[in-house]
Structure formats: structure tokens, C-alpha cells
Amino acid sequence: MIGVLLVNLGTPDNPKTPAVRKYLREFLMDGRVIDIPYIFRSLLVNGIIAPFRAPKSAKIYQELWDDRGSPLKYYGEDVVRDLQNKLGDAYYVRLAMRYQSPDMKSALADMQSKGLKKLIVIPFFPQYASATTGSVYERVMELMKDWQVMPDL
């Protein structure tokens, strides 16, 4: 079986301020996103950006979300469903977010249980950037480093 992991940047678990704050912290604490020493990044993100930006961002997320939830997430799920239908049973397609849910760790663990022969990782970004595509591939390698059986990538 061939696994296809579609990865988008991420979205908060809900449009309320605590969830948005959690999302911002996870996203902005990635050293590939804000490329400064950890201590300064931590002070900036946890002391300034997350506390002050989360309430404003939550209001915007509340306007974007609808009955299905986050458009970024449910449109991604729609793509997974359609791609799975097109590719058939020889493929196993999953959606993951680099930050938040559905998380890459769970998606890869699920894919590992399928005994994949090959894994195709497709970031949903229009071009390569260290902060996006680079972060996705780095996280995939980090999560797969202890796998006993490694699929072709």
C-alpha cells in the first residue's frame, strides 16, 4: 500500500481565544518560522504575540468558521475523500496539519499501522520555504526516526 499524507499549515481546534493562543504558540515557537534563539523567541511569542494577538485573531476565526468548523480543515478533508476515491484501495490518504489537529504524529502512526511500502508527503504550499515545507519534512523525519520498517519516501 502507498500512503499519501497531505499536510497543511494548521488551524486552531476552535475559534475561541484559548485555542487560538495555543495554535499561535505552537506555530510561532517553531524555529523555522521565527528564526531567532529559543529564549528570545519564547519571550516574544509567549510574552507579546500570543497574549495580545490571540483575542484579535479569535474574532477573525469566528467570522470564518461555519457549521462544519474551520474551512481549512474541512476543505482538506474533502480533498482527502476525493483523492482517496480517485486513487482507490492501493493508496491510503490522510490529512494532517503541521500545527494542531489533525496532527502529523497521529496521521503517521495510523499510516505506519497500515504497513506502507511507500509514503508520499505533499505539503499544501505553493512554493518551498523553510518555514513551511521545510518544517513539514523536518517533522516527518523526526516522527519516523524510530520506525523499525521505513517505507520508501
Task: Give residue spans per PLM region.
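Active-site-proximal alpha-helix that buttresses catalytic centers in soluble enzyme cores
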Residues: M1-L153
